[in-house]
Regions:
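Short glycine-rich substrate-engagement loop in P-loop NTPases that contacts/grips substrate
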Residues: 156-176
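Catalytic-core helical/loop segments in enzymes performing group transfer/polymerization on anionic/lipid-linked
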Residues: 43-56, 79, 84
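Conserved helicase motor core of SF1/SF2 NTP-dependent helicases
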Residues: 63, 69-82, 86-157, 168, ...
């Protein structure tokens, strides 16, 4: 270096090829090597000379890689389930969360469209139906059972009276007894969330299947949040898919340890560990719960996740939840949550916020890179609690923050 002063640092600390033999001596002169406790500068130089790098994961890169790997692994169900050959084609898939049920539904629906056929996809949850509709190709019908019922009732002569206490019983009776127009018969019928269907719903949907059509019934007993009995499907071929490819293995292991899996679940995710954090609040302290939820958002943002990567899932239903009735948690944390109202076309109305917030009931069937599972509180860990924990925790693809009461934490620790 011709003029070391131009470098902006002490010229005595600049070494080049001609003075490389002085490297060790300069370091010893500059750093307190003899000190019992070397300072921060000494540690930095040691890490530099030892080629030690301070790295942190890039969530944006991990999200893309995780989605690609999980899709590839879980795609096996969609591939070989559709290679099965029997007639009539009536396939019941009992599959755990993250086993590829959605990919199978997408593959079957898309193949029907490509073949010029008319498919029907029916699930329980409206949010899941809206989510799947964005993934499916144009054509056919993608609905929740209640959307299907509403459309049928309107086509038969008028809008249902949703003010009546027995409105759904009336609609079910109408769908069971009314003649079925040809326009309501489908070549392919796919039922998702079958564990939430009743026998009456089964009969209503399956009467829409053409005689030589294909039918696939997808269900997960571990996600039975409504306590329904398993619907009998006599004569159907049953296929079990017990590997969860989506949830990090640590989450699957925790759920197995606390007894949240009624049927065995195998961890098949490419990610062994999960970024799991617990934030505790005193039982019954709503303000503390909200404060810990805000802290959970900060933790997710600090880990590099964007607001679009984060979903808030409440352990409570929408009516009993505190968070799901708020427009915001703070000035910077606004919420996008269902208001409980619908427009004239039957579309659900959402608050115009930046962070998605749903109940564990409505978010079933979907997932996000980072999940904040909040308002977790229970006096006794019964089967419903275990199923809600299973559903909520398996929504997370990379990071999971549990916001739970102190009494809920004690019961979890007792089981682990």
């Amino acid at each position: 270096m011709r003029d070391p002063h131009l470098a902006g640092i002490d010229p005595r600390h600049i070494l080049d090829a001609s003075s490389k033999h002085r490297l060790a001596a300069v370091i010893r002169e500059t750093l307190p090597v003899a000190d019992a406790e070397p300072n921060e500068q000494f540690d930095k130089v040691t890490r530099f000379l030892g080629n030690m790098l301070s790295l942190r994961p890039d969530p944006s890169s991990m999200i893309g890689n995780a989605a690609e790997m999980v899709s590839r692994l879980a795609g096996g169900l969609a591939t070989w389930a559709r290679r099965l050959d029997f007639a009539p084609f009536r396939l019941r898939v009992v599959g755990t969360a993250g086993s590829g049920k959605t990919q199978l539904a997408l593959a079957e629906f898309s193949a029907a469209i490509d073949a010029g056929l008319c498919p029907l996809y029916v699930c329980y949850n409206r949010p899941l139906a809206d989510h799947i509709a964005r993934l499916m190709p144009a054509g056919g019908r993608v609905v929740s059972f209640h959307m299907l019922s509403d459309a049928f009732a309107r086509e038969q002569g008028g809008a249902p009276n949703y003010g009546a206490s027995d409105v759904w019983e009336q609609i079910e009776a109408q769908m069971t007894a009314s003649p079925l127009p040809e326009s309501w018969k489908y070549d392919v019928v796919i039922v998702d969330e079958g564990q939430d269907f009743s026998i009456a719903w089964r009969d209503i949907v399956l009467r829409m299947l053409k005689e030589d059509g294909r039918a696939i019934w997808l269900e997960d007993p571990n996600q039975n949040l409504y306590g329904k009995d398993s619907v009998p499907l006599p004569g159907w071929v049953t296929l079990h898919s017990d590997t969860n490819y989506r949830s990090p293995r640590q989450i699957v292991d925790i759920l197995a340890a606390i007894g949240a899996t009624q049927t065995p679940v195998e961890a098949g995710s490419p990610f062994k560990g999960a970024d799991i954090e617990e934030l505790i609040y005193p039982e019954g302290d709503t303000e503390a719960m909200l404060a810990q939820t805000r802290r959970a958002i900060t933790l997710c943002l600090g880990a590099g996740f964007t607001r679009d990567d984060i979903a808030i899932a409440s352990f409570r239903g929408r009516e009993k939840s505190v968070i799901l009735h708020l427009d915001q948690l703070s000035d910077v944390h606004t919420l996008k949550s269902f208001t409980g109202e619908y427009d004239l076309f039957g579309n659900p109305q959402y608050r115009d916020g930046g962070l998605l917030a749903e109940s564990v009931y409505r978010f079933k069937g979907q997932s996000a890179p980072a999940i904040i599972f909040t308002e977790i509180d229970f006096a006794e860990m019964d089967q419903l609690v275990l199923r809600k924990l299973f559903v909520g925790m398996t929504r997370a693809r990379l990071k999971l923050v549990l916001v739970l009461s102190d009494r809920a934490e004690r019961q979890l620790l007792d089981r682990l």
